[in-house]
Amino acid sequence: MEPVDPRLEPWKHPGSQPKTACNNCYCKKCCYHCQVCFLTKGLGISYGRKKRRQRRGPPQGSQTHQVSLSKQPTSQPRGDPTGPKESKEKVERETETDPAVQ
């Protein structure tokens, strides 16, 4: 191994920079091109700012969908609207009058 000039910065040492520039190709050869390519392409690690995804515009039929939701009636409480006492009495009457149950 040849001696390196001590006055030279480490990133300027011979062989520290690849002879070809980095590119956007993701083939095996380009993924192992240099340490930066290996981290970003091979491992998928990037410490830069994340690109903000653009929100897609609403589909063309969405306006009618929103209108139909607002026209729906409000939810009603579950169970018999007459009340719990009346529903129990109604069940008792039905069981008394139904001869097939016995």
UniProtKB/Swiss-Prot annotation:
Q: Where is this motif: Cell attachment site?
A: 78-80
Q: Where is this cross-link: Glycyl lysine isopeptide (Lys-Gly) (interchain with G-Cter in ubiquitin)?
A: 71
Ranges for the region named Cysteine-rich are 22-37
Q: Name one GO biological process term.
A: symbiont-mediated perturbation of host chromatin organization
Q: Is DNA damage set as a keyword in this record?
A: no
A Pfam family per the record? Tat
Q: What stretches pass through the bilayer?
A: none
Q: Spans of biased composition, class Basic and acidic residues?
A: 83-96
List every stretch annotated Interaction with human CREBBP.
1-24
Q: Does the keyword Nucleotide-binding apply?
A: no
Q: Name one GO cellular component term.
A: host cell cytoplasm
- Locate the compositionally biased regions of type Polar residues: 62-77
- The residues annotated as site (Essential for Tat translocation through the endosomal membrane) are 11
- Where is Zn(2+) 1 annotated to bind? 22, 33-34, 37
Gene3D superfamilies, A to Z: Tat domain
What GO MF terms are annotated?
actinin binding; cyclin binding; metal ion binding; protein domain specific binding; protein serine/threonine phosphatase inhibitor activity; RNA-binding transcription regulator activity; trans-activation response element binding
- Identify the residues that bind Zn(2+) 2: 25, 27, 30
Region Disordered: start-end pairs: 48-102
Q: What else is known?
A: HIV-1 lineages are divided in three main groups, M (for Major), O (for Outlier), and N (for New, or Non-M, Non-O). The vast majority of strains found worldwide belong to the group M. Group O seems to be endemic to and largely confined to Cameroon and neighboring countries in West Central Africa, where these viruses represent a small minority of HIV-1 strains. The group N is represented by a limited number of isolates from Cameroonian persons. The group M is further subdivided in 9 clades or subtypes (A to D, F to H, J and K).
Report the HAMAP family cross-referenced here: HIV_TAT
This molecule's function is given as: Transcriptional activator that increases RNA Pol II processivity, thereby increasing the level of full-length viral transcripts. Recognizes a hairpin structure at the 5'-LTR of the nascent viral mRNAs referred to as the transactivation responsive RNA element (TAR) and recruits the cyclin T1-CDK9 complex (P-TEFb complex) that will in turn hyperphosphorylate the RNA polymerase II to allow efficient elongation. The CDK9 component of P-TEFb and other Tat-activated kinases hyperphosphorylate the C-terminus of RNA Pol II that becomes stabilized and much more processive. Extracellular circulating Tat can be endocytosed by surrounding uninfected cells via the binding to several surface receptors such as CD26, CXCR4, heparan sulfate proteoglycans (HSPG) or LDLR. Neurons are rarely infected, but they internalize Tat via their LDLR. Through its interaction with nuclear HATs, Tat is potentially able to control the acetylation-dependent cellular gene expression. Modulates the expression of many cellular genes involved in cell survival, proliferation or in coding for cytokines or cytokine receptors. Tat plays a role in T-cell and neurons apoptosis.
Q: Of which family is this protein a member?
A: Belongs to the lentiviruses Tat family.
**What is stated about domains?**
The cell attachment site mediates the interaction with ITGAV/ITGB3 and ITGA5/ITGB1 integrins, leading to vascular cell migration and invasion. This interaction also provides endothelial cells with the adhesion signal they require to grow in response to mitogens.
Q: What is this protein called?
A: Protein Tat
Can you name the source organism? Human immunodeficiency virus type 1 group M subtype B (isolate RF/HAT3)
